[in-house]
From Swiss-Prot:
Composition-biased stretches (Low complexity): 240-258
Residues with PTM Phosphoserine: 101, 131, 644, 759, 813, 818, 867, 907, 928
Basic and acidic residues bias: start-end ranges: 23-35, 87-106, 218-239
Protein name: Myopalladin
Tissue expression: Expressed in adult skeletal muscle and fetal heart.
Organism name: Homo sapiens
Gene designation per UniProt: MYPN
Lineage: Eukaryota, Metazoa, Chordata, Craniata, Vertebrata
Amino acid sequence: MQDDSIEASTSISQLLRESYLAETRHRGNNERSRAEPSSNPCHFGSPSGAAEGGGGQDDLPDLSAFLSQEELDESVNLARLAINYDPLEKADETQARKRLSPDQMKHSPNLSFEPNFCQDNPRSPTSSKESPQEAKRPQYCSETQSKKVFLNKAADFIEELSSLFKSHSSKRIRPRACKNHKSKLESQNKVMQENSSSFSDLSERRERSSVPIPIPADTRDNEVNHALEQQEAKRREAEQAASEAAGGDTTPGSSPSSLYYEEPLGQPPRFTQKLRSREVPEGTRVQLDCIVVGIPPPQVRWYCEGKELENSPDIHIVQAGNLHSLTIAEAFEEDTGRYSCFASNIYGTDSTSAEIYIEGVSSSDSEGDPNKEEMNRIQKPNEVSSPPTTSAVIPPAVPQAQHLVAQPRVATIQQCQSPTNYLQGLDGKPIIAAPVFTKMLQNLSASEGQLVVFECRVKGAPSPKVEWYREGTLIEDSPDFRILQKKPRSMAEPEEICTLVIAEVFAEDSGCFTCTASNKYGTVSSIAQLHVRGNEDLSNNGSLHSANSTTNLAAIEPQPSPPHSEPPSVEQPPKPKLEGVLVNHNEPRSSSRIGLRVHFNLPEDDKGSEASSEAGVVTTRQTRPDSFQERFNGQATKTPEPSSPVKEPPPVLAKPKLDSTQLQQLHNQVLLEQHQLQNPPPSSPKEFPFSMTVLNSNAPPAVTTSSKQVKAPSSQTFSLARPKYFFPSTNTTAATVAPSSSPVFTLSSTPQTIQRTVSKESLLVSHPSVQTKSPGGLSIQNEPLPPGPTEPTPPPFTFSIPSGNQFQPRCVSPIPVSPTSRIQNPVAFLSSVLPSLPAIPPTNAMGLPRSAPSMPSQGLAKKNTKSPQPVNDDNIRETKNAVIRDLGKKITFSDVRPNQQEYKISSFEQRLMNEIEFRLERTPVDESDDEIQHDEIPTGKCIAPIFDKRLKHFRVTEGSPVTFTCKIVGIPVPKVYWFKDGKQISKRNEHCKMRREGDGTCSLHIESTTSDDDGNYTIMAANPQGRISCSGHLMVQSLPIRSRLTSAGQSHRGRSRVQERDKEPLQERFFRPHFLQAPGDMVAHEGRLCRLDCKVSGLPPPELTWLLNGQPVLPDASHKMLVRETGVHSLLIDPLTQRDAGTYKCIATNKTGQNSFSLELSVVAKEVKKAPVILEKLQNCGVPEGHPVRLECRVIGMPPPVFYWKKDNETIPCTRERISMHQDTTGYACLLIQPAKKSDAGWYTLSAKNEAGIVSCTARLDIYAQWHHQIPPPMSVRPSGSRYGSLTSKGLDIFSAFSSMESTMVYSCSSRSVVESDEL
């Protein structure tokens, strides 16, 4: 850009000189025109300044012709300010302008305006590829438009002047604007013609700091179109102001303030009301509102997941002043996502974002689909089967793989720019967002026709997409296979419960079930086995017999490696990326553990680096074994077309949709990487040929149908038994095989639903070469391995495969990791904590990791004694049946001790334990078993705890020892807590001893079990990234059962599977009662319903007895015992009385024993409510004026009533003078008037009210004059209740017999008053 400006500088200088002459002639050579002011602060109006267009870096003498040395130096300073211009520096620039002398402004006023112009100029660069002739249009030389030309060229001069000094600061600053004038002129014309502008997401990157960041030229063009509109409007104002100024006189002595005007105060956009996240049901109307302010009014754009939204029939964008709204007329699943609103003006940008969740889907559902479709489209041509006898040359498939990865990498960059609301660390990046299983699938065993439920829990941000697979085949939601996914109840508990319900299982449903959760940050899977017991014995050996199907493999026996021994190796290719080691991940059913695949693709790793061993994908078990489509080094290839390891593998997909083989390879890479740390590679490589390669295929594979063994001189052979079966092996040119590695095939027999692991105990030693024979007669062979200098040649071994068409070997070729791999990459980062092969020895007798149950050492010794003997086909056939029987037994039964047996619990028990774990993971804990401390704000990469090995269920007899063992990994090292039946076990507990090893293995040991130890044991691991737990059940049986169990343990090896299966229910029939749920002490109200609920387990189902204070509770009208379908027992008491208070004890009893719990029930007395009742009514009375009078009444009620007094139906306030109200606890109420006046005469009413009701009574008060004596009425009245009534009725004057104070107790009782009061 700078070079273009320099090359065009000469023509600019010439144009400015011509413009200067034309302007001088137009002004009549008036000297005052030099000081002509401009009304637009963004431009300048000096003809001399216009002529100063000297251009290049080497044309400074041209500038000196128009400027003095002092002005030239000042131009340099102002040009530097123009490059580094920042809106926050306006005040400093204003002061700088004031410091210029009037003389300088008179001769060079352009210098005063230069900073103001450059404020907008950096936002107006355009393409520099336009024709240079654009600057020489005739309109710039016209005298009629000389003012406009002068103003435009003067602005260009400042830009040209600034370009002279860019080279001095280019090493520390790359200017974002001030490109050459040719492209700018054309861009301005385009803006005037199109009257449109485009705004990019990259507008967020506009810096307000004094040092701008580099921005590509193509993005700068889009960044400034809006600013050009503002600038064009100012230019039009400048033309009008200039024409007005041309008619007036401007003297050289004008005030400097007249040379420029202050720019209107502006402010960047700011959202006063931000968008709010919402969750709405599908089909409803959604509206997002925000309010943004800014000067000038900002331009607003809407985006959904990084894509700009425009007005359409479905989406309406409305602006009402500062209020901006986005309305979705009808929301559907595809509308779920993150919506952002960006506002920008020439002073800056601002944005706000919100998540829209459509009920029933997650925000991640709208992501990843294009990549998935693209991957499927690329993979479809590769899913082609070849005949068994087809030979093919295997070309590298790197170009295809590179095309596969190109698009996702771009998507990753866009996703990183979009705002997120994930948990962030100190660096502002998400700590971790990959999915994590907080509850994994459990292995299940069921009978035909039963209901089976697989359940797991997963969390991740954004919400992961969950898919279910059976033997690698995707399961769709159907009436037979119901897929349920419960969304998080709140943001505080982001767990999703994923469930697969099989309404009715059959024998063919047996197999491996996988639940895969994925979002844009990674993929994680949980695997479990389902075993369906059919009507026939699935282990019938006769169904597995075959005549002539054998497979021979050369392998290396595990043996201790000398500290300085050099394992055979070869030279590495330039950049080996994806590596693996052949490992058997299938254990016997009795000890199989949950498989876990985790793909940690952390945001800080998405920076354009190549995919390599740093890809961070780890897996612990291979899934989808029947899938023909395989992947090597991240590439999708056909089975007979593996890629060459010489080529560099493509980068990792941004949203990986990994199949089982790729995950298996990456996991094996971690295993071998740690193994190499323990066995360093040699300094001098030597050749180590190993056939069955699919990663290095420079020669065509030798494929033959002969049933004989075929020896190939090279190690480039590759064969297929059937198009579906795939045999990868080690890499010829990139293998570093340590003496402790032991490749083992894992065979899967789908029709019989039994997985068999080929152990070394059943392998027969053969010649030092490798052969692989299949029913089709295809053969794969390896040459003998040359011995190492310090290592004897390991004897290879052979195993036989009956009925080869029913097995599919599942293995991954071991390719070592480069010794120069960075430790910072996720693979090396996880290699120290994830499952690995121990150094010495790496495997047990079965070729499994040492933690798996191994076979008797005697059997291994017997096999080793036969190792020097050659083996032929006859010997293999003779031992075939024995091998099959041994494999079946070792897969089906675990090698357990008589006193500690592992067993399988029912699905009901499993769900109960899941409930306990779910509650514990959300309950505060008291203490941990160790002194591990975690930072409040974690730093670096963090990984939530993961169980590499889970707790098992044990059945022991009283007095026997038992040990619960599991292995936990996580970063940072998790804290560990142990619980029994939901109650935390203290680390000071002497009975239960807790231990923790350095490799993450945790154990709980009970030396001598008692009946109280029976229950559920749970271990919970926690670190700042989350919590995870798993449980194991301990069944403690009484001594009479021990002999039966011992005999069963001694004879179970000689029984068939049918007998073993028939025997299991007999053992499970004796299950001591165990309370899974029990109520605590309760307080209940008398007269209400009281319910005591408990849940108990046991076989046979126990009987419950309730005791109250030691006496049995018998069922009657108010006491009922109920049992619900869920197994909850309830004692109902309705209504509750005081007699029901006391200590309750519930006893559960069955054949094996009993269990009980107690609680205290307190009964709160029932509150008595009674409506008010008048015991003594108000009495009519009359008193002389001036005397006191008392109106009395007595009312009772429960609770005590509240009294209200009224006179002539108007409430009497308590503050009225001469009137006071009194009452006591006995219900006595009194209204005292002292002294009485004429105005007090009238009808008085007393109302008594409580919660139960209200009652009232009324009486008449008469006031007489002092001389008046009451005359008895002529008519007879009934006797009054007053003690003075009889005297009054006889005409006696009571007032004459008592003092004035005593007269207040007198009640007048005329017949009229009494009768009327009674009626009221």
